[in-house]
A protein has these predicted regions:
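Loop/turn elements at helix/coil->beta-strand transitions in domains of secreted/extracellular proteins
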Residues: 73-76, 103-106, 155-158, 179-183, ...
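The feature captures the conserved acid-bearing segment of alpha/beta-hydrolase catalytic domains
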Residues: 183, 195-253
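Primarily recognizes the serine-hydrolase "nucleophile elbow" in alpha/beta-hydrolase
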Residues: 145-211
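Hydrophobic alpha-helical scaffolding
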Residues: 130-133, 137, 164, 171-175, ...
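Alpha-helical segments flanking ligand/cofactor-binding loops in enzyme cores
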Residues: 98, 172-173, 220
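Flexible loop/turn segments at secondary-structure boundaries
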Residues: 59, 84-87, 115-119, 168-171, ...
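Alpha/beta-hydrolase-fold serine-hydrolase catalytic core, especially in secreted/extracellular enzymes
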Residues: 1-61, 89, 230-367
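Cap/lid segment of the alpha/beta-hydrolase catalytic domain
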Residues: 69-156, 189-200
Length: 367
């Protein structure tokens, strides 16, 4: 292979991934509306504001926007979430978001479909459906659209994606779907032999694109832009230093950009988003987005209670009147024949549960 050959394959992959994900049919049905915003909470060097963005009619994605208190144009990092217990509300997630914001990047995280406040609308079982794969990708793209349309303090030359585990899978997917991303950092997710154990990562047949692909090749389509792969010895990313990373270096080499892809491998660590993994992310974005590394101090981040990060109240009492309140209502937006294949079934549920059990997260808040 060479640069020209891989460039043609990249074009084919990007086109077919969109088709197999069904993303354009969903985006065509989305509404343009003002986000529901909470009051802004001020902390040491950054602020936090909750948002609820209507996507499909009556369907909302909820999250939080972490903004630096420094003036001027900022980098933007979209942060899809993984399956670690506590979701986007957990302590290490808030630490990462707040720290990157203090360093100078606007960071946005958001609930998985069927997690967090999304449960109010579709229930938790909806997450274990293939529909989650498409909707979560759609949410990431629409949040990027919203942020760029509503803010004047974003440097469009510095747009990143970063997530761990399933959030890492979606980080790669976002970079395939949208050319506006300029840096990518999937954490404890990338493997050539594993496409993500949850239907929200692998429910739609995107791995069959262009005659068959894998997440390592999808990540390679980001070349020659900066990309960090964080891996460890305790999960399916154990092979990254000997298999996936050399492959990525080869592809980046076609563009004379071998130095633009990096791997931080932690052989004695397990599947989590622990301090060493977060530090790798901070170093990467400080380098590629010129953030202020002197502001790297997680102890300055305030860990908020989960309820403070809700858009719809502690019991969902603020959910808008026209909001969808069942997973079946979401089905109306999918082609009926397609949706028959998407709906949560026992095999997908078993796959999801077996996968969670296999992780051995040793986390009191299991996925």
């Amino acid at each position: 292979a060479d640069k020209q050959t891989f460039g043609l394959r990249t074009d084919s992959l990007k086109k077919e991934v969109r088709q197999r994900l069904g993303i354009d049919a969903m985006l065509a049905q989305c509404v343009k509306s003002e986000a529901i915003l909470s009051k802004t909470r001020k902390f040491d060097g950054y602020t936090v504001q909750n948002f609820a963005l209507e996507t499909l009619p009556g369907l909302y994605v909820c999250g939080s926007i972490y903004t630096p208190q420094s003036k001027g144009k900022h980098a933007l990092i979209i942060c899809p979430n993984g399956h670690f217990g506590g979701g986007r509300y957990r302590e290490d997630q808030q630490q990462r978001m707040g720290t990157l914001a203090r360093m100078g990047a606007i960071c946005v995280d958001y609930d998985l479909f069927g997690w967090g406040e999304s449960i109010l609308q579709v229930g938790s079982a909806a997450h274990r459906s293939s529909a989650a794969h498409t909707i979560q990708a759609m949410n990431g793209l629409l949040i990027l659209d919203y942020m760029l349309a509503s803010r004047k303090d974003i440097d469009t030359g510095r747009i990143g994606a970063n997530g761990g585990s399933g959030g890492g899978t979606h980080t790669v997917l976002l970079s395939v779907l949208d050319d506006r991303f300029t840096a990518s950092a999937p954490v404890v997710s990338l493997a050539s032999h594993f496409d993500g154990g949850c239907p929200c990562e692998s429910g739609m047949p995107i791995q069959l694109s262009a005659g068959g692909t894998c997440n390592a090749e999808l990540a390679a389509t980001f070349a020659p832009l900066p990309q960090l792969i964080v891996s460890d010895g305790g999960d399916w990313t154990a092979s990254v230093p000997t298999l996936e990373f050399p492959y990525l270096q080869r592809i980046y080499g076609f563009y004379h950009a071998k130095d633009k892809v990096t791997n931080v491998h932690l052989p004695n660590e397990k599947h989590d988003f622990g301090p060493n993994k977060r530090n790798a992310v901070y170093d990467f974005f400080a380098d590629v987005f010129h953030l202020d590394k002197k502001k790297l101090d997680e102890s300055k981040v305030t860990i908020e209670p989960e309820a403070a990060m809700y858009s719809f109240g502690e019991k969902g009492e603020l959910l808008p009147e026209g909001a969808i309140r069942s997973f079946d209502k979401v089905a109306a937006y999918f082609d009926k024949k397609v949706f028959a294949r998407l709906n949560s079934d026992t095999s997908l549920e078993k796959k999801a549960m077996d996968w969670v059990a296999s992780l051995n997260l040793n986390d009191e808040r299991k996925a």
